[in-house]
Amino acid sequence: MASVTEAIILNSIKYSETSVIMKCYSQNYGILSFIIKGVRSRKRTKFSLGSIEPLSIVEIEFNRLKKGELSHLKNIKSVVIYDDLRFNIIKSNIALFLAEFLSNVLRFQEENTSLYQYIKDSLVTCLLYTSDAAD
């Protein structure tokens, strides 16, 4: 049965030559892990590495498996796009710190819609709507 939910990507780990394992915190299911095959290959695939960067807010479609098993993504779509995150060293460092912090804090977190919404709103405010302190 296909499920669709919004999620914040916490991290992704290289799994093989062409695959990654992605961990995210979802609005409806809590912590989820997926294996994404072919995302690192030279051939064109429906998933790109840019769409699975840490702290990306995405909408994912997947088949729900038993707890503890890695699911396969059917589709992923960006909800919030951080335009300057790659090019702004200050925001990039903040994002890396927050991704690592959230990954450790939310390690066993179950579904909690209000916590998800708070984290999402905080990330959008911090990474999207703040200007450089160096300017």
PLM feature spans:
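Residues that form generic nucleotide/phosphate-binding pockets
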Residues: 101, 122-125
